């Protein structure tokens, strides 16, 4: 048995991280430029930020574009994404170690993260996923270690990347404080207050920007209700937002962006209330899209992508389910924060857009569970802390 701090563990971890780095560098060199519309837009926004210190996109959060502007679009931004993705390997090791206190399980987790095709792919395509996943993992590691201030900083930075985590983070502060670290109610209240202070301090510049841009307080951005309506309207047939029959012309006539945002929200709620059966059917379609083993987009439904996706994701999913069914019974309280995020993210994308791209942030948690199952099935029993 190897321990978490002995030389063999450190050597294995270093080798795994090196393999992950080499694979990401190879992908950066060999993978053709994908030119995702979002990636092209992020690069243009980074140039705009660098040249004029302006950010005029009402539908996106700014942190990834700010970091791209600071590193410079091109190979330096790519290198930074590769660094973040490689750091996520180390963070996954730390998360598994914090959960199970078993070095072998942590090493298997790190190895899976290092070679997992989706993490390699997203490390080199210029999207926000890599930054968001790295910050999310960092927040969870810090919470499990009891570093609430660092966890709060990582959480809010993840919200400034993508606002997905906004509603769940304060709930997790309470859960980790009361049930993982067994702090008193007074100490928990202090942790929540600390999170609130950090949230305000880090979000305040963005709020000032939004107030100058829109003349009113906008806490996150104006994209959520656009997506809500795009995902819930009579013309949406697939559960995505790329249906050819989508029509937003009635809203584009509204010049005020905040009023337009409210109109999107009201129209979506009206549609859901008037046809709840259709809403439920769409939610089912979105669930299927979200958990589908291979990509939905036509460009990525070639045999290579389909087989590669199935071979990588399906074993992880099956092993994660095996862990949850057969090995997690005495460990539920400790793993619940991961399960909560998996359920939370799934629920959001059953209401909003269903896409395997948006599933990526929960896949490190599936890998953690899968690694635990694999080690248990191999006969190395461990007792959860």
PLM regions: where:
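Extracytoplasmic catalytic/substrate-binding loops of multi-pass membrane glycan-assembly enzymes
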Residues: 31-45, 54-67, 75, 218-221, ...
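Membrane-interface anchor segments at the N-terminal boundary of transmembrane helices
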Residues: 75-76, 264, 270-274, 278-342, ...
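Membrane-proximal stem/loop segments at transmembrane-domain junctions that anchor or position
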Residues: 211, 217-285, 289
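Short helix- or helix-capping micro-motifs
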Residues: 20-23, 106-117, 141, 155-159, ...
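Specific aromatic-rich, kink-prone transmembrane helix
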Residues: 91-95, 112, 131-150, 155, ...
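Transmembrane-helix motifs of polytopic, lipid-linked glycan transferases
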Residues: 76-100, 115, 138, 318-325
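Membrane-interface transmembrane helices that cradle and orient dolichyl/undecaprenyl
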Residues: 1-2, 98, 139-150, 176-183, ...
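Loop-to-helix entry region of an early transmembrane alpha helix in multi-pass inner-membrane enzymes
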Residues: 62-66, 72-90, 107-110, 122, ...
């Amino acid at each position: 048995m190897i321990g978490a701090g002995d030389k063999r563990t450190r050597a294995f971890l270093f080798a795994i991280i090196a393999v992950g780095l080499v694979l990401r560098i190879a992908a950066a060199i060999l993978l053709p430029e994908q030119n995702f519309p979002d990636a092209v837009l992020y690069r243009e926004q980074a140039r705009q930020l660098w040249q004029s210190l302006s950010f005029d996109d009402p539908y996106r959060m700014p942190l990834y574009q700010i970091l791209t502007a600071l590193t410079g679009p091109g190979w330096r931004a790519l290198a930074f994404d590769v660094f973040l993705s490689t750091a996520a390997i180390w963070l996954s090791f730390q998360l598994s170690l914090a959960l199970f206190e078993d070095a072998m399980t942590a090493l298997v987790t790190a190895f899976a993260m290092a070679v997992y095709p989706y993490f390699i792919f997203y490390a080199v395509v210029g999207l926000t996923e890599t930054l968001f996943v790295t910050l999310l993992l960092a927040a969870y590691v810090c919470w499990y270690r009891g570093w609430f201030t660092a966890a709060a900083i990582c959480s809010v930075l993840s919200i400034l990347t993508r606002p997905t985590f906004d509603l769940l983070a304060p709930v997790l502060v309470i859960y980790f404080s009361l049930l993982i670290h067994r702090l008193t109610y007074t100490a928990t209240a202090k942790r929540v207050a600390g999170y609130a202070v950090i949230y305000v301090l880090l979000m305040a510049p963005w709020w000032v920007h939004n107030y100058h841009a829109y003349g009113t307080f906008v806490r996150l951005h104006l994209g959520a209700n656009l997506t809500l309506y795009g995902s819930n309207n009579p013309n949406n047939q697939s559960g995505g937002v790329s249906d050819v029959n989508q029509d937003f012309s009635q809203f584009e006539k509204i010049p005020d962006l905040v009023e337009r945002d409210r109109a999107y929200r009201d129209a979506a709620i009206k549609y859901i209330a008037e046809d709840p059966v259709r809403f439920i059917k769409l939610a089912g379609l979105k669930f299927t899209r979200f958990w589908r083993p291979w990509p939905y987009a036509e460009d990525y439904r070639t045999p290579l992508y389909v087989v590669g996706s199935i071979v990588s994701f399906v074993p992880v999913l099956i092993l994660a389910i095996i862990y949850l069914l057969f090995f997690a019974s005495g460990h539920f309280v400790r793993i619940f924060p991961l399960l909560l995020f998996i359920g939370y993210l799934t629920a959001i994308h059953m209401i909003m857009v269903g896409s395997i791209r948006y599933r990526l942030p929960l896949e490190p948690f599936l890998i953690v569970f899968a690694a635990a199952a694999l080690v248990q099935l191999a006969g190395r029993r461990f007792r959860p802390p």
